[in-house]
């Protein structure tokens, strides 16, 4: 845990050591769950590559998975326990990301030539089964 400023600095530096910030999700959590939390890719909007179809979509997709994981702990099911569907969706998305990173396709920041749409479609297809 860190303040917003230091959390932002750390969330930028950590992923940069991997060679790309296109993989890093981010979450600003309200632990009391009484105010909204924020889930976004570390790289932000990447205006320098807007419209070129070369951005790595993994961080955005993974941020959505983080949101589902967070919701799994805050949304009780009919039995009062955390709703397992959120956790299952999170796990399916993360597994699809992992498989895509191992087998491809890969965007230019990962040494490949796949477009944003191709990478996103590959992950979506794996989630869909």
Predicted feature locations:
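Glycine-rich phosphate/nucleotide-binding loop
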Residues: 2-92, 96-103
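Short, amphipathic C-terminal "tail helix"
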Residues: 107-129
């Amino acid at each position: 845990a860190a303040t917003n400023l230091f959390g932002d600095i750390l969330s930028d530096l950590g992923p940069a050591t991997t060679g790309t910030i296109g993989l890093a999700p981010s979450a600003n959590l309200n632990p009391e769950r009484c105010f909204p939390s924020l889930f976004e890719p570390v790289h932000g909007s990447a205006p320098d590559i807007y419209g070129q179809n070369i951005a790595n979509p993994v961080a955005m997709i993974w941020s959505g998975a983080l949101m589902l994981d967070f919701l799994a702990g805050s949304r009780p099911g009919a039995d009062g326990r955390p709703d397992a569907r959120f956790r299952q969706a999170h796990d399916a998305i993360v597994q699809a990301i992992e498989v895509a990173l191992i087998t491809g396709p890969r965007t230019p920041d990962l040494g490949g030539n796949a477009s944003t749409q191709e990478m996103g479609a590959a992950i979506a297809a794996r989630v869909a089964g």
